[in-house]
Swiss-Prot record:
Gene3D superfamilies: 2.40.280.10. Keywords: Cytoplasm, RNA-binding. This is SsrA-binding protein. The gene is smpB. GO terms for cellular component: cytosol.
Amino acid sequence: MSKKNTADNHIVTNKKVFHDYFLEEHFEAGIALEGWEVKAVRAGRIQIKESYILVKDQQVYLFGALIHPLASASSHIFPEAQRTRKLLLHRYQIAKLIGASERDGYTLMPVSLYWKNGFVKVDVAIAKGKKEFDKRQVKKDQDWKKTQSRIMKAHKRQL
C-alpha cells in the first residue's frame, strides 16, 4: 500500500499569521469536532483566518474558527458554525503554552489544519506580534531577494 501524498493531508493554512506575527515554536494539537463538522472539513468548508487560541481553566480552546455546515450532513440538528472548540494536548504542552501566552507580547495562533491518520490536527504556534516597521523590513527583504534572483538569472544567461 502506497503512502498518501502529504499535499492531500493539508486542509487550510492561516496565511495572515505569517504576515502579522513572528512564529517561534509549533505544537501539534488534536481538535474536538462533532460529526457534521468533520464532514464539512472534508468538504473544505472551514475558515481559520480570524481565529485565535486562548487558555481557560487549564484547557486550550480555539475561538473564531468558522465551519460552514453542509445541508445534507446537518439536517437533523442546528449547527453552530462559530462555536468554541477544545484543543487536545498533553499536560506538559498546555503548561508550556500557558507560560508562553502569559509573557508580554506573545499569543497563541492556529497556523494550519491537516489530516493525520484520519484525525484533524491543528498546528498551534507561539507567536509574537510584528510591529509596522518589522512588516516593512520583511517586505524589503523579500523584494531584495526577488531582485537578487533576477540579477543572478540575468547574469547566468550572459555566460
